[in-house]
Amino acid sequence: MAAASGLIPTRVLLVVEEKAQLELLQVFSGRGDAAHSHLLEVHLGQEAQLNHGVLACADGVASLFAQCAVEQEPRSTYTFTSVVQGWSLGRIEPRVIQVDGQASTTLKGLAVADAEQQLAVHTSVCFEGPDGELDQLQKCLAAGRSHTIFNGAINVPVSYTHLRAHET
């Protein structure tokens, strides 16, 4: 999606049924004074798989807020990969809830900022059942007077054991 100026809002609801597999690539392109606000809501059925990519590039002036809200049923797999570059102000926010456990989540991202750009990646993964897995790797490159922020929250109730969470 690209525009010269103004607000560009989108909201998508995606239901991936039991045992289904899907690959999704979202591309956000920002030019001029455009303000992007995007929400993707996903429900993954049991044993469903979603490979989700976000490529967000801008000219240094536009702003971006992109949120992914994902619910995972048992034995589902969600893989999220993002590359964000060139936004004056940008925020990517994947939020995942493993509803009854036994799900696998992979979050990987790269944020590239220059000049006075400010980019933030805020992730949240909530384990609401046992035997969940998380693999997370977030990287950033910042030059000039730019800033990049990563904030990763993992919510694990004390009663659940056998969780594997790796965050870098």
Predicted feature residues:
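Conserved beta-strand/loop scaffold segments within soluble protein domains that form the structured core
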Residues: 1-167
